[in-house]
Regions:
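C-terminal, loop-rich substrate-recognition/catalytic regions characterized by aromatic stacking residues
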Residues: 1-190
């Protein structure tokens, strides 16, 4: 996908306290957001523990942000609360600025179009995806204005980037990428 570090990836009416529970359909279907989704779950699935996304990816630039979101997709017909039909509720998320893929003490530019592993720590969660819901993963490279814009070019201080530093970049995520999370089988409900 091509990423331009400009458009917002959440609604204009968003406020700081609300962004964590905002419906993620605002990003679903965008050309600069990759979306992966399961079929409706046949049974409840409880995720309990550390979650990490392992992206094998490349950028045509020399820096890029990698944002990964784990989402609970409600059924389109949700009788318990009809306004929640199809709602995409964010369960876990985080951002990795590509320059820090080798550690925060060793920022380094990416080699353009070279596949690197980017590990996005999505922290520890305990969450039950209910039967009939879907599990979704979204991958994107901007979360502006929640997260400051990355110029897609390695600069010593991103906050001092000039207009000339900002460039369009092509991000690629490869099939060997995966999301690692523990499923608590002691809490399986059929």
């Amino acid at each position: 996908y091509r990423h331009r570090p400009i458009p917002s990836t959440f609604t204009a009416s968003s406020n700081w306290p609300e962004w964590l529970s905002e419906d993620q359909r605002v990003a679903d279907g965008r050309a600069d957001v990759l979306t992966y989704e399961t079929e409706p779950l046949a049974a409840d699935v409880t995720v309990s523990g550390a979650i990490a996304a392992h992206l094998f990816a490349s950028t045509s630039g020399t820096d890029s942000d990698w944002i990964v979101k784990l989402i609970d997709v409600y059924p389109e017909q949700y009788d318990a609360d009809p306004k929640m039909g199809g709602y995409e509720f964010m369960v876990a998320n985080d951002v990795l600025r590509g320059r820090f893929r080798k550690g925060y003490s060793d920022p380094a530019p990416a080699v353009p179009n070279h596949v690197d592993e980017y590990t996005v720590d999505m922290h520890t969660q305990c969450y039950r995806f209910l039967k009939g819901h879907r599990i979704m993963v979204q991958v994107q490279s901007t979360w502006f204005p929640l997260i400051d814009r990355n110029p897609q070019k390695f600069v010593p201080n991103i906050f001092a980037a000039t207009d000339a530093d900002f460039q369009v970049a092509r991000q690629r995520v490869f099939r060997s990428s995966y999301l690692d999370f523990p499923v608590d089988t002691s809490r399986v409900v059929q």
